Amino acid sequence: VQRVEEPSGLPVRSQSWELTGLRRALGPARDHARQFLEAGSDDLAEDLLQDALVVVAELVSNAIRHAPGPCVLTLSQDGGRLLVSVRDGSASSPAPRPPDLSAGGGGFGWHLVQRLSERVEVYTHGESGKTVTATLVLVGGVKRCEV
């Protein structure tokens, strides 16, 4: 685990994992996230842990589905906030689409990420890709993004 100091002087825990661009990367991504969160907090509520794991799975799944090649998952915990970042090789911004309730075609992920997160940001890196970062509140009353 890498530790860096923020200007506030508070330590930030951060760790990154390179994942294949294959669906089998979803399980390891969730496992990494669970281990990271459990190592950083003895009293993280189960519902908040599950919310974080859903956000990790959805962001990694979107990267695998819509971007070529591997992606990088980075988790950073700063006090009561968790930043879930996924960098992929597509410069296209995520585009919400209507959920497909009949054919099982998805469409729920981006809506879930926005609903479970306090904030979601997309940073583009020219033609080399983008990073999607979701910020989750891990303590107290959870303020969620407006959908």
Which stretches of residues belong to each language-model region?
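Short beta-to-alpha transition helix within the HATPase_c
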Residues: 11-31, 35
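Conserved short strand/loop->alpha-helix "switch" segment adjacent to the catalytic nucleotide/phosphoryl-transfer site
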Residues: 31-57
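Conserved beta-strand-loop-beta-strand hairpin that lines the nucleotide-binding pocket
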Residues: 1-20, 64-147
